[in-house]
Curated annotation (Swiss-Prot):
The chain crosses the membrane at residues 52-72. InterPro entries: TMEM207. Disulfide bonds: none annotated. GO terms for cellular component: membrane. This is Transmembrane protein 207. Residues 1-29 form the signal peptide. Keywords: Membrane, Signal, Transmembrane, Transmembrane helix. It is found in: Membrane. Its main location: membrane. It comes from Mus musculus. The gene is Tmem207. PANTHER family: TRANSMEMBRANE PROTEIN 207. It is a single-pass type I membrane protein. Interacts with WWOX. Coiled coil: none annotated.
């Protein structure tokens, strides 16, 4: 009969606690006190094992930061923030209108395009020598 994952994790936590308990008892115990000697109260002297509590505190802070970062990563992955943006160039050509180009940057999921400035697009004089485009019927005959 197999146990589920939460019970395995709980048993590992209990095992780790049982292994760490003697370490903490040793830090908190007064080892310098013998049977015939007068013992010094633990609260009246500086503990020798302060660094263990310091490392335990650092470990807990790192563990907390790791859990927060893991949850943040899962949340960002689920929300799908920052979808890849695509650029689309639109050129409008008409008999009476000058030739101009506009570049739109839009998101594929939102369908909203935002005009952007692009200096690489040719200006109207660049296309002025070509003349108007051929009629639709001539294009069909050429194919």
């Amino acid at each position: 009969m197999s146990t589920s994952s939460p019970f395995r994790v709980a048993s590992k936590i209990v095992t780790a606690g049982c292994l760490c308990l003697p370490l903490f008892q040793r830090v908190l115990s007064d080892l310098s006190c013998e049977e015939n000697e007068m013992c010094v109260n633990y609260d009246e002297r500086y503990p020798d094992g302060w660094y263990i509590w310091f490392f335990l505190l650092i470990f807990l802070v790192v563990l907390l930061c790791g859990v927060v970062l893991f949850c943040l990563q899962c949340w960002l992955k689920r929300c799908g923030i920052n979808p890849p943006r695509r650029t689309m160039a639109v050129f409008a050509v008409g008999d009476l209108d000058p030739v101009y180009g506009a570049e739109m940057a839009g998101s594929p999921t939102s369908g909203i395009c935002h005009p952007t400035q692009n200096t690489e697009l040719c200006s109207a004089p660049c296309f002025g020598a070509l003349g108007p485009p051929p009629p639709y019927e001539e294009i069909l005959k050429a194919n």
